């Protein structure tokens, strides 16, 4: 029998995962969490399902409902995955440290990795991301590279090494961009209208 279609739901009291046609029943191995949760999402590949609660982030194997990993970050308001689910990205509300400096509130984690007993997961990279709009990184289809939009440019990184900018695409006034989902690795940038300049969308290979 083919794998059933699946959907998840979030209410004020908890989260559930349901196998739809042809079985229409709750996912057998999933223990429904209770209490407040801020957000939830599937990975684009459908392999993982994650949600954020007051205690942290939990990731399960969507096919069986078993917990894959937990992230020790309790203030998450947005969740995202890379295309193949290798990385999970979290966004927390902007805040400052004792010196008034902005804390790095966008964090990238490996979804599944072996962790020694007594150790916690370590972030792959982190950034200051003030806006909740367009907060997430964008990845190439093979997850080799990822990118984010900053003032007047799009910065590209090797996905496993986020401490060093791999290359930059300079675009004065850019506010948004998109990486093509296929193998040609084109990038489109959006530059909004300003004074006499009209909206501009540029497609760059």
Regions found by a protein language model. Name each.
Residues 6, 48-49, 95-101, 145:
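Short consensus segments that form the blades of beta-propeller domains
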Residues 20-23, 62-65, 111-114, 159-162, ...:
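Short loop/turn segments that connect beta-strands within beta-propeller blades
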Residues 12-17, 56-58, 96-107, 152-157, ...:
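Structural motif
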Residues 1-29, 38, 47:
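Intrinsically disordered, low-complexity acidic/Ser/Thr/Pro-rich linker and tail segments
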Residues 33-37, 73-77, 129-134, 169-175:
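Short coil/turn segments at the loop-to-beta-strand junctions that recur within blades
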Residues 1-4, 38-48, 78-87, 136-145, ...:
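Blade-terminus and WD-like Trp-Asp/Gly-His loop motifs, strongest in beta-propeller folds
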Residues 24-31, 66-70, 122-128, 163-168:
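A short beta-strand motif characteristic of beta-propeller blades
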Residues 9, 51, 90, 148, ...:
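Residue position within the beta-strands of beta-propeller blades
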């Amino acid at each position: 029998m083919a794998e059933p279609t699946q959907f998840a739901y979030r209410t004020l009291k908890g989260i559930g995962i349901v196998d739809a046609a042809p079985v229409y029943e709750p996912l057998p191995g999933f223990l429904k969490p209770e209490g407040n949760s801020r957000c939830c999402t599937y990975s684009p590949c459908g392999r993982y399902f994650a949600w954020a609660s007051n205690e942290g982030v939990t990731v399960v194997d969507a096919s069986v409902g078993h917990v894959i990993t937990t992230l020790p970050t309790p203030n998450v308001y947005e969740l995202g995955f890379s295309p193949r689910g290798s990385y999970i990205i979290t966004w927390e509300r902007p805040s400052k440290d004792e010196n008034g400096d902005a804390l790095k509130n966008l964090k990238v984690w490996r979804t599944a990795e072996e962790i020694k007993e007594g150790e916690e997961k370590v972030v792959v990279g982190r950034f200051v991301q003030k806006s909740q709009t367009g907060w997430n990184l964008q990845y190439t289809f093979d997850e080799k590279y990822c990118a984010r939009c900053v003032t007047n440019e799009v910065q590209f990184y090797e996905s496993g090494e986020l401490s060093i900018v791999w290359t930059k695409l300079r675009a004065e006034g850019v506010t948004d961009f998109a990486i093509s989902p296929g193998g040609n690795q084109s990038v489109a940038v959006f530059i909004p209208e300003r004074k006499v300049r009209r909206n501009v969308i540029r497609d760059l290979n």
